[in-house]
Amino acid sequence: MKNLIKYICLFALFPMWTSCEDEGLDVRDIEIPSGYALSAGTSTLFMNSSKAYDSPADWVSGTYKSRFFAGDGLYDDIRTSDNDTGGGLGPVYAGYSCGSCHRNAGRTKPALWTEGGSGSYGFSAMLVYVTRKNGAFFPDYGRVIHDQAIYGVKPEGKLRTKLHYKTFQFPDGEEYELCYPEYEIHEWYADSIAPEDLFCTVRIPLRHVGMGQMMAIDPKEIETLAARSNYPEYGISGRANYINERGVLSLGLSGNKAQHADLTVELGFSSDMGVTNSRYPEEICEGQSQMQGGSMMGLSYDQLDISTEDMEDVDLYMQALGVPARRNVNNKTVKRGEEMFYQAKCHLCHVTTLHTKPRGSALLNGTGLPWLGSQTIHPYSDFLLHDMGSEIMGVGLNDNYVSGLARGNEWRTTPLWGIGLQEKVNGHTYFLHDGRARNLLEAIMWHGGEGEASKNLFRDMPKEDRDALIRFLESL
């Protein structure tokens, strides 16, 4: 009964203490019932609906609230190719809004191959990174293939997909199937470069939930994890990625390969939509022959497509998103699954608890942390790079794509917070960098390399315990 009273009081007081940050109240001052965790401190969101990734944290009020919804609108705005407000799309592009890829601030499914074609949104929220086989980017083509273009302009290329399947078996006889997509570029715009000389790797969008907390994590804590991430008995040895962001060598935290140390709003608007801004003022296809002359279809390309103020509102929107609280934490099966999570040593990489920088610190882009600082958060990630293997089905998770210090077989540990709501928010259960895992079980069974030992511990569990571990993941 004592814990129940605390639980009721916690929910009753939550709106009050999240709005009193200036009085020095810290989430660690709140006594939380045993077995229950606030996912993101004062940014924890008590919501179990399709808007669970796309809603403001409770502290968002006043000016912050109006800016949040302004940023939300810009995030979802369908860009057009004219020069008016909301324009600037193209001339070539891979998506026409942030929300067309990150639906409800989540991830759309890999419709390029799940629907047998490019889908209604071109690559349908899949980014296709393309380089020469030596890893060099192509000048005048940005970092991704732009498979769509405004009227009168040629898209940069298209993609064909071939799926490979293989059936495996657990020791108890239950079967499971893995598949992976193989891609081939065709209709490549640059006639001087043969498609067979190109290398491509595909991404489906990451969830944007928890981006503010992620950017606010104390880097010293991640560096400490890297220093002690050495578990030879399980083959685990994580390392940090460092990249040059805004002219500063910084610890990478976001992106599939921890290749970003900052919110990538300006990069996304430029690289994915062709929307120029103060950080990326040049058109992504500036040097292409079809752009010669400086204008096309009567459009001007000598002014920025979106203002710095608008970019800052989108930044704030992403920083202020709430993180869904865990659900069903007292369910017997979920509790058993949590035990299995630790028994399989998943927690050695999917680290449960981290802390953000002290209140009064700033993000890399200069934004202060009045609401994100001094928080205890539970992202279930160490944000380190790990070798995920190249053996499963002859390819493993090695995409041969280098990003910063990350090699092709290395991936950042994916934060698991909010993962259990993906089907409700986005209507599908595709996981991993390219969506090849069609459910959480397949995502686990794709673990190789440093994840091999944990996968094998999971594989050898009785079916009841495997199912319980999945139920635990669904509670996050």
Enumerate the language-model features and the residues they cover:
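Sec-dependent signal peptide recognition
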Residues: 2-10
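Short, compositionally biased low-complexity segments
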Residues: 6, 33-49, 275-293
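C-terminal motif of bacterial Sec signal peptides marking the signal peptidase cleavage site
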Residues: 16-19
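Bacterial signal peptide processing site
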Residues: 21-24
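Short glycine/threonine-rich turn/loop motifs
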Residues: 29-62, 66-243, 323-433, 442-445
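Active-site substrate-binding loop specific to GH73 endo-beta-N-acetylglucosaminidase modules
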Residues: 211-212, 225, 229-302
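Extracellular low-complexity, Gly/Ser/Thr-rich intrinsically disordered linkers
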Residues: 279-323, 333-339, 410-476
